[in-house]
Design a protein with these regions (language model features):
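A short linear-motif detector with a strong N-terminal bias
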Residues: 20-22, 82-84, 130-131, 144-150
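Residue-level preference for alpha-helix termini and adjacent loops
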Residues: 2, 16, 20-22, 101, ...
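Extracytoplasmic loops and strand-loop junctions of Gram-negative outer membrane beta-barrel proteins
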Residues: 12-15, 69-79, 129-138
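Short linear motifs at secondary-structure transitions and domain/linker junctions
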Residues: 6-8, 66-70, 79-81, 126-128, ...
C-alpha cells in the first residue's frame, strides 16, 4: 500500500426560532498520504469552509431585565445582520522514521481567511416609552497565515517508564 485517500465533507442548513435568522455552512477536506519508501510518508491536504449566518445579538434590557417580547422577536434588522467567512487551507506533513524510536516530522500549512460581518442591533436599553436606539457596524478582513513546524522525537525507556524526548523548530 503506497497511497491512501480520504474525503471529509459536511453541510448544514439551520433556521432559528428568531424571525429572519438562519445559518448555512459547508466544508470539504480531501487528503492523500503517499508512502515514499518504507520509512517516509507525506500527507497532502486541502480544506475549504464556507459559513453564512445571521448575527443575532439577543434581547435588549428593560429596567435591569430582558425586555418582555416573544422569543421569535429579532431586535435589529435580520436582513442586514449577516456574517460570512470563507477559509481555504493547504497543508503538507512529512514523516520519517529513522529507527530505534527516532522520528522526524515537518508540518506546513498555508491558510487564507476572508471574513465579513455586519450587525444592526439594540444599542440601548428599552426606555419607558418602549423605544430603543439601534446601532450598527460592519467589518471585513482578509488574512493569510503561514505555519511551519519541525519536530525530532526520540522514544526511550528509563527508570521503568517510556519517555518521549522532543526537539523542534
Amino acid at each position: 500500500d503506497s497511497a491512501a485517500w480520504r474525503l471529509n465533507a459536511m453541510a448544514e442548513s439551520a433556521d432559528s426560532f428568531r424571525k429572519g435568522a438562519d445559518m448555512k455552512r459547508y466544508a470539504v477536506n480531501p487528503t492523500t498520504t503517499l508512502a515514499l519508501g518504507e520509512s517516509t510518508a507525506v500527507t497532502l491536504g486541502y480544506e475549504h469552509l464556507r459559513d453564512e449566518r445571521t448575527a443575532d445579538r439577543g434581547f435588549p434590557s428593560f429596567n435591569g431585565a430582558p425586555f418582555n417580547a416573544g422569543p421569535g422577536t429579532f431586535f435589529g434588522n435580520a436582513g442586514q445582520s449577516n456574517a460570512r467567512s470563507t477559509v481555504d487551507g493547504l497543508y503538507a506533513v512529512l514523516d520519517h522514521e529513522f529507527g530505534n524510536g527516532l522520528q522526524l516530522k515537518n508540518s506546513f500549512r498555508a491558510t487564507h481567511y476572508d471574513k465579513f460581518y455586519q450587525n444592526v442591533y439594540p444599542g440601548s436599553a428599552v426606555n419607558t416609552a418602549g423605544n430603543l436606539t439601534l446601532s450598527a457596524y460592519n467589518n471585513a478582513n482578509q488574512r493569510t497565515n503561514l505555519f511551519n513546524q519541525t519536530d525530532l522525537t526520540k522514544k526511550i525507556r528509563a527508570g521503568g517508564f517510556e519517555h518521549t524526548l522532543l526537539a523542534g523548530l
